[in-house]
Amino acid sequence: MKWIFILLTQIFLCAQTGLEIAQMLDQKPAPKDLSNMTRMILTNQKGKSRTNIMISKSLNKNKKQMIWFQEPKDDRGVSFLKVEHESGDDMRMWLPAFKKVRRISAKKKGDSFMGSDLSFEDLSNRNVNNNNYTRLSDEIVDNLDCYVLEIIPKKKAKSSYGKHISWIEKKTLNLLKESSYNKRGDIEKNKVFQYEHIKSYHVLKKVSVENITKKHSTEITFSDIKIDRGLRDDLFHEKNLKRLPK
C-alpha cells in the first residue's frame, strides 16, 4: 500500500499547474507578525560598499510593513510604510531632510528602494490574479527538488518587469532563487533567498540580489528575528513614520 501512496503523490505533484503552484505558495502558512534588524549592503561595480541598518516590522504576510533607517547617520530617520490593497499598494516615505512624506505612485514602483537593487515593486507581494503562470520543467537546486515557474505580469499589474523565472522547493514551498527580466526580454536581476527555521515557519534570513544591467549588488541579512509578538494594526500608519521605535 505504501508504494501506491507514493505513486499517487508523485502523480499529484506532476499534475499541478503553474497557477495551482502559485496558489499553494500564496496560501503557505506564515507568522502573523514579524520584526527584525535588517542590514543592507550595497556594492557597486568598483567594489565600493555602503551599509544601511534598519528596523523592520510587518503584519499579515508582509502586506503591511514599516521600515525605519538607523544607519548611516545621513539616512537616520528616513522611514517607509507599505499597506497592500486589492486595488493597489499604498507606499509612503518620510524624508526628514525635506520634512515631507513622499507617496510612491504606481508609475514609480519600478524605482530603486534607497539605492538598492530592489525596486519598490520588489517589496510587495505578488497578487496571484495579476499574473499568468506557466510550469516549466522541474529542476534540482542545491540537491533540492524544485518547481520552476514562469511568471508573466498581466497588464493590470502595471509591472516594470516583463517576466520572472522562479525556483520553488517542493517540500517547503520556499522560493530559492529567481531571475527577473525587463520588458525587452533581457535578464535584469538574479535573486537568491535563504531561510531560518523558527518555530513551525521558514523565515527569510538572507536575500542576495545581483543587478546584471547595472553591475551592482545588494545583500540583505535579517537578525534578531521575532515572530507573533502581537503587533497592533494601528502601528502601520503614516503618523508613525516620524517615530523611531525604541
Predicted feature residues:
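Flexible, processing/modification-adjacent segments and terminal tails
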Residues: 16-33, 39-41, 48-50, 75, ...
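One face of beta-strands
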Residues: 34, 38, 65-67, 91, ...
